């Protein structure tokens, strides 16, 4: 039998601890002990008769239609969301478009919870999920639930700017953990926490870690299972809550072999799941991980649907926050997504994830091959990522031909970026992702293989190489 999660209520913020359930959300769950239908005159729910959207139909790929050798190759199926239905396994518009609980539509939530069990199977009793409007919103809920103004939070040395901009206005100090090509260093995390001096830092010892473990944004690094175990052990040692932000989790890839092609690996769903690197959630015996999942990278970012998985304490407190803020994810999105997932089933969704994995592996290989071909090796260095959407590369500062101008790293990067845009290629400057600008002494750029057409990669990288050759000794 799985263990009970630890009582971690001492981690709750003042804001979270003071939240009460919305009475209007509570009354919506009222039931008669006489088992008679409740006629509701309580909540201000609009009558579905006045919803102008009467039915939604969507064309979706038939299972394995993305495989050229499949009998379904190129086939599209149609899924429908009716206004009403007597089928208990249908999410009708009368429900999807109505006010609902902060946890999200029950049918879609059940599907995603089962998906989470298949992939991660958290090893403690009572875990659950809450639907969110994506990981950015989920992070805001988690930060407000766990931190107070004046606290510090552990983050990777380079991190997602939107996450940092969620933290700083809440009065949080972001404490950078050193990184190498394989992600952040457990020994750096342990050193920071072991030697924490509240007077020097001006804040209490951190009790929250924010990390993007797989295909990290911006570096593309992926924590090994051994390093994840070390980090989890340190979280237990120092009583840390781990915010596991994993939008790129399913974009795990085989190693780059120096060519643009990629093998469309034939393996079963069971093999696919087994090959995924274990998550922090899967090793969380204490209930100290809040895992944030999103459909943004594997379905569509505009759907604004995600979910977080956690122990009962954090689920209940998160629900109290969601029900008076975001309330729930878009009903239109939930209706269409559930119709699609119901049509595919769990196995069909895993087939889709395998397809997405292969597609991004191919894209990564094409961009890396273009970089291998055009970027000056005397100036540029990079590690091929094994997950995610990004390649992070360093440009050797010592070879900058305008060193006499004493420009800062951000100034140099901004200059190179502006010249690149003039040449018709856009990319991200490394300083945008730096947590502590005081220790920013290297030139980095981040490129993504997610969006541009494959045939555009060579053109873009050749253009950028020209900019580098105009500014560095190549």
Curated annotation (Swiss-Prot):
Transmembrane segments: none
EC category: transferase
Swiss-Prot/TrEMBL GO biological process terms: aromatic amino acid family catabolic process; lysine biosynthetic process via aminoadipic acid; tyrosine biosynthetic process
Reported cofactor(s): pyridoxal 5'-phosphate
Cell location: Cytoplasm
Single GO cellular component term: cytosol
Transmembrane keyword on record: no
Pfam families cross-referenced by the UniProt entry: Aminotran_1_2
Domain of life: Eukaryota
Keyword set includes Cytoplasm: yes
Entries under Gene3D superfamilies matching the protein: Type I PLP-dependent aspartate aminotransferase-like (Major domain) (3.40.640.10)
Recorded catalytic activity of this chain's protein: an aromatic L-alpha-amino acid + 2-oxoglutarate = an aromatic oxo-acid + L-glutamate
Keywords: Aminotransferase, Cytoplasm, Pyridoxal phosphate, Transferase
Gene Ontology molecular function: 2-aminoadipate transaminase activity; aromatic-amino-acid transaminase activity; pyridoxal phosphate binding
EC number, as in UniProt: 2.6.1.57
Protein task: Has aromatic amino acid transaminase activity.
UniProt similarity note: Belongs to the class-I pyridoxal-phosphate-dependent aminotransferase family.
Protein name: Aromatic amino acid aminotransferase C56E4.03
Origin species: Schizosaccharomyces pombe (strain 972 / ATCC 24843) (Fission yeast)
């Amino acid at each position: 039998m799985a263990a009970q999660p630890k009582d971690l209520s001492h981690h709750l913020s003042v804001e979270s601890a003071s939240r009460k359930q919305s009475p209007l959300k509570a009354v919506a769950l009222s039931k008669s002990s006489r088992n008679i239908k409740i006629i509701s005159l309580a909540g201000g729910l609009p009558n579905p008769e006045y919803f102008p959207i009467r039915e939604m139909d969507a064309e979706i790929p038939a299972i394995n239609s993305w495989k050229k050798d499949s009998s379904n190759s190129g086939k599209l199926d149609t899924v429908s969301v009716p206004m009403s239905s007597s089928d208990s396994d249908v999410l009708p518009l009368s429900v999807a478009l109505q006010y609902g609980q902060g946890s999200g539509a029950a049918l879609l939530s059940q599907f995603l919870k089962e998906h989470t069990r298949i992939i991660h199977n958290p090893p403690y009793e009572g875990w659950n999920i809450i639907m969110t409007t994506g990981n950015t919103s989920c992070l805001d809920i988690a930060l407000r639930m766990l931190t107070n103004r004046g606290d510090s939070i552990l983050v990777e040395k380079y991190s997602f700017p939107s996450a940092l901009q969620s933290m700083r206005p809440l009065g949080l100090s972001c404490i950078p953990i050193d990184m190498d090509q394989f992600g952040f260093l457990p020994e750096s995390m342990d050193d920071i926490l072991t030697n924490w001096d509240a007077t020097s830092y001006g804040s209490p010892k951190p009790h929250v870690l924010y990390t993007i473990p797989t295909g990290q944004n911006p570096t593309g690094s992926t924590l090994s299972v051994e390093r994840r175990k070390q980090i989890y052990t340190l979280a237990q040692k120092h009583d840390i809550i781990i915010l596991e932000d994993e939008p790129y989790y399913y974009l795990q890839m085989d190693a780059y072999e120096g060519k643009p092609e990629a093998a469309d690996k034939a393996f079963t769903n069971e093999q696919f799941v087994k090959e995924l690197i274990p998550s922090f959630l899967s090793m969380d015996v204490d209930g100290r991980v809040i895992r944030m999942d999103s459909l943004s990278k594997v379905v569509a970012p505009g759907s604004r649907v995600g979910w977080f998985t956690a122990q009962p304490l954090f689920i209940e407190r998160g629900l109290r926050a969601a029900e008076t803020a975001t309330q729930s994810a878009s009903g239109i999105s939930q209706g269409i997504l559930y119709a699609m997932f119901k049509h595919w089933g769990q196995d069909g969704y895993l087939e889709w994830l395998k397809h997405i994995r292969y597609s991004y592996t191919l894209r990564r290989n094409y961009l890396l091959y273009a970089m291998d071909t055009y970027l000056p090796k005397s100036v540029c260095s990079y590690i091929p990522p094994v997950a995610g959407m990004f390649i992070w590369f360093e440009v050797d500062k010592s070879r900058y031909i305008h060193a006499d101008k004493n420009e800062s790293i951000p100034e140099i990067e901004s200059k190179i970026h502006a010249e690149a845009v003039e040449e018709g290629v856009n990319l991200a400057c490394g300083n945008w992702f730096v947590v502590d600008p005081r220790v920013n002494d290297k030139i980095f750029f981040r490129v993504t293989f997610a969006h541009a057409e494959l045939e555009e990669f060579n053109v873009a990288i050749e253009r950028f190489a020209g900019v580098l050759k105009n500014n560095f000794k190549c």
